[in-house]
Curated annotation (Swiss-Prot):
The gene is ctaB2. Carbon 2 of the heme B porphyrin ring is defined according to the Fischer nomenclature. GO terms for molecular function: protoheme IX farnesyltransferase activity. One of its GO terms (cellular component) is plasma membrane. Converts heme B (protoheme IX) to heme O by substitution of the vinyl group on carbon 2 of heme B porphyrin ring with a hydroxyethyl farnesyl side group. It comes from Saccharopolyspora erythraea (strain ATCC 11635 / DSM 40517 / JCM 4748 / NBRC 13426 / NCIMB 8594 / NRRL 2338). GO terms for biological process: heme O biosynthetic process. Its main location: membrane. It is a multi-pass membrane protein. Keywords: Cell membrane, Heme biosynthesis, Membrane, Transferase, Transmembrane, Transmembrane helix. This is Protoheme IX farnesyltransferase 2.
Length: 324
């Protein structure tokens, strides 16, 4: 370990939420509905689905069947909801320590841990059956594999043990584009993997900027996020590195798209690079920083790229010839 890092205070966070005290069930239907909605984390799902539609449009070289799009989005929502609900069960012990997550349903005991576990498993099984029936077996298998990876590899292993947790664990968040592509074509082609890579490189700057803001929260919970174990200048430098990788990676889609996507990818990439470099410069000078601003603007950046890709694909603009 280099001098850029320091140790994290140890804390026992290995107990599961299933062993938590009996929950106080929500009393009203509206309260119960809100609690279960909180388990699936709708805002996270919304971002994932935004990346699915452009992948399907590019795979179809135009506009695919509306029914296929709806079916894939429904299945993807169920799969993401399953992963998020199971994540809430596994992380209930650290959620109750962190100020940012203390309002979650299992922490407030509006849903029992057992019911949340059953809910998550049911959503996962439902997503498999739904995607198999409405799209194809490959999409269904990829969805279940994503759930298992997110829960057992990221949540239970990587998140609590390594500062690189979000780098490798974030691969689960990249899968909706692959599932969407497979839903249209029945296979996984190179453009799907390129889109996977865009989100893979986007995830660290997005998450580390949030973790910079809530560093004390993560440290209190014993989660070794990079901003917890590394110096701020090292973290901001890594954000710059991954931002460059992300922007350059977006250009790999140029041969499979038209001028509209390429122009927006370059412009949006240049804008986000300026933001990342500005954060790093402020960190190096010891000036006050606003990492949460970068976090929110990273969502804007991804939205711009995805919308440009969707419009470009829907209009079937000239293709330079991607080998697939």
């Amino acid at each position: 370990m280099t001098k850029e890092f320091h140790a994290v205070g140890e804390r026992s966070v290995v107990t599961t939420a299933v062993d938590a005290p009996q929950a106080r069930h929500a009393r009203r239907p509206a309260e119960l509905l809100k609690a279960y909605a909180g388990l699936i984390k709708p805002r996270v799902i919304e971002l994932l689905l935004v990346t699915t539609i452009p992948a399907m449009l590019l795979a179809a070289r135009g506009i695919p069947s509306p029914w296929l799009v709806i079916a894939t989005l429904v299945g993807g929502t169920m799969a993401a909801g399953s992963a998020n609900a199971l994540n809430c069960v596994a992380d209930a012990d650290i959620d109750q320590v962190m100020k940012r997550t203390r309002a979650r349903p299992l922490v407030r005991h509006t849903v029992s841990n057992r019911h949340a576990l059953v809910f998550g498993i049911a959503l996962g099984a439902g997503s498999f059956g739904w995607l198999w029936a409405t799209t194809n077996l490959l999409s269904a298998v990829l969805a279940v594999a994503t759930i298992l990876f997110y829960v057992f590899v990221y949540t239970l292993v990587l998140k609590r043990r390594t500062a690189q947790n979000i780098v490798w664990g974030g691969a689960a968040g990249c899968m909706p584009v692959v599932i969407g592509w497979a839903g249209v074509t029945g296979r996984v082609d190179w453009p799907a993997l390129v889109m996977f890579g865009i989100i893979f490189f986007w995830t660290p700057p997005h998450t580390w900027s949030l973790a910079m803001k809530y560093r004390d929260d993560y440290e209190r919970a014993g989660v070794p996020m990079l901003p917890v174990v590394a110096r701020p200048t090292y973290v901001s430098r890594q954000i710059v590195v991954f931002t460059w990788l992300m922007v350059l990676w977006t250009l790999l889609l140029a041969p499979a798209t038209g001028w509209l996507y390429t122009a927006f990818a370059i412009a949006a990439g240049a804008w986000f690079l300026v933001l990342a470099h500005r954060l790093h410069a402020q960190t190096r000078r010891g000036e006050p920083t606003k990492p949460l601003k970068l976090f929110h603007l990273s969502n804007t950046y991804l939205m711009i790229v995805c919308v440009a890709l969707a419009v470009d694909s829907a209009l079937s603009l000239p293709v330079l010839g991607w080998p697939f």
